[in-house]
Structure formats: structure tokens, C-alpha cells
């Protein structure tokens, strides 16, 4: 598949190359299952360079592609899809199925040189080497006005959580400038992915905080490191 590398947290277009080699006795296939721990959206499929209309069915752990007719010949199949990755070496595994035989009968595609036009033979995508667990922390605004008028009443925050192969502790908290914790927005275990939260301007007791500057702190606890990222946010009326 290509490309073999991607940037974390950014939607990337990939192409998966399958070289099918079928004998005269083969019953062929009319379905392709593309499995991954990452979500994906199939945008096109070609057989020997010719576009083929397929039906994409979302299944647990991947997407099943239903071909319009049985494939009983050797060919180069190219699957275009879009995915956003948060884990290094995310795998994409392809399986060939014959609908007449049921889903229990499947042939996994082996990694290898499907076409000389693509240098990569891998079925996993690498992310750039780095030590960050938290990436692309963004606030909906530098300040907000939680006065109940329905305009700018909530502060939104989003960030990428990277390299969490298993659920790990994630804490998102609000402090005043004196270091006193006012509100916990998240104290749970999370997996790698895009995280979105909101603060309504209230403290833990449900009281509206006074106008001023506050510190928003995100802390991710990994196996080998703990990373903390902070942002200042203003509350005004």
C-alpha cells in the first residue's frame, strides 16, 4: 500500500494494491474485506486500471466491498481509501471472499510486491518518530462568555491522543492562576484518537467562575512517559 508513512491526526489518502493470482479451478471472489483498527472510507476501486463501482458495507473492524460480479481471473486490484491515524504501524489487512461460500471462508492477502510502480510492500503505515502523546491541542476561542445568552457560552477543546495502544489515564482539568483546581473535565482512561471536550464555565460545585484568566491543563499518562500541555483561557461577561 502507499504511502507507507503519514502524519498523525491528519486525514490521508491511501491506495491498497492487491495482485490476485487465480487458477482455472478457482471459484473466484466477489467480496474484499479491508480490516484495520483505524476507521477508513473507501473512495474508489480499480481492476487492471479500470474503475469498478462497488458497494461499501461498514463492518466491525473494517469495510466490506461487494463487487458487481465474480472475479475469476488474475488481476491488479487497487483500493483507494482515506483514513486518519493515531498509532504507529497501523495495519490494514485485506481478505478475499466468495459470497456463495460465506464469510467463514476467506483468503488473506499476503504482504509483497503487488506492482513495480510502488516501492512499499508493507501493509502497515508508519508515523514520524516522536515522543509526543498530545498533539494539535486547539481551543474554540481564546476566551468565552458563559452568561447564558446562547452565544459563546461554552469553550470547546480538541486534541489528538497519540501512541495509546491500550486505554491509559487522561486528565483534563481547569485551574485558577493560583494553582487551585476548579473543575475536572475528564478523569478517565482513553485510547488513541481525536478527543473533544467542553467547559461550560462552571466549577465542581456548579457555580459560575469569576471573570479572569484560567489554566486549562491536559495530562496523558503513557507507559513510559507522562505529558502535560497547558493553555490559558479567558472568561469574560
Q: Where in the sequence are the language-model features?
A:
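A eukaryote-biased signal for long
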Residues: 30, 34-49, 81-85, 94-100
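Low-complexity, serine/threonine/proline/glycine-rich extracellular segments that form mucin-like
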Residues: 9-46, 170
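Extracellular acidic, Ser/Thr/Pro-rich low-complexity tracts
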Residues: 18-24, 34-38, 83-85, 160-165, ...
Amino acid at each position: 500500500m502507499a504511502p507507507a508513512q503519514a502524519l498523525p491526526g491528519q486525514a490521508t489518502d491511501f491506495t491498497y494494491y492487491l495482485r490476485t493470482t487465480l487458477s482455472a479451478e478457482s471459484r473466484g471472489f466477489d467480496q474484499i474485506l479491508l480490516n484495520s483498527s483505524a476507521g477508513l472510507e473507501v473512495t474508489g476501486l480499480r481492476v487492471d486500471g479500470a474503475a469498478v463501482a462497488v458497494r461499501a458495507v461498514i463492518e466491525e473492524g473494517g469495510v466490506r466491498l461487494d463487487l458487481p460480479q465474480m472475479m475469476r481471473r488474475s488481476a491488479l486490484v487497487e483500493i483507494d481509501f482515506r483514513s486518519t491515524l493515531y498509532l504507529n504501524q497501523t495495519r490494514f489487512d485485506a481478505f478475499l471472499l466468495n459470497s456463495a461460500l460465506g464469510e467463514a471462508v476467506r483468503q488473506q492477502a499476503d504482504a509483497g510486491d503487488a506492482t513495480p510502480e510502488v516501492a512499499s510492500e508493507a501493509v502497515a503505515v508508519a508515523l514520524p518518530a516522536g515522543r509526543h502523546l498530545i498533539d494539535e491541542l486547539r481551543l474554540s476561542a481564546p476566551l468565552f462568555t458563559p452568561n447564558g445568552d446562547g452565544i459563546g457560552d461554552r469553550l470547546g477543546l480538541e486534541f489528538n491522543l497519540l501512541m495509546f495502544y491500550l486505554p491509559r489515564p487522561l486528565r483534563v482539568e481547569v485551574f485558577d492562576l493560583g494553582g487551585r483546581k476548579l473543575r475536572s473535565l475528564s478523569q478517565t482512561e482513553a485510547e488513541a484518537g481525536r478527543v473533544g471536550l467542553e467547559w461550560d464555565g462552571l466549577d465542581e460545585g456548579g457555580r459560575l467562575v469569576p471573570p479572569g484568566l484560567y489554566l486549562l491543563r491536559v495530562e496523558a499518562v503513557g507507559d513510559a512517559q507522562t505529558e502535560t500541555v497547558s493553555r490559558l483561557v479567558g472568561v469574560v461577561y
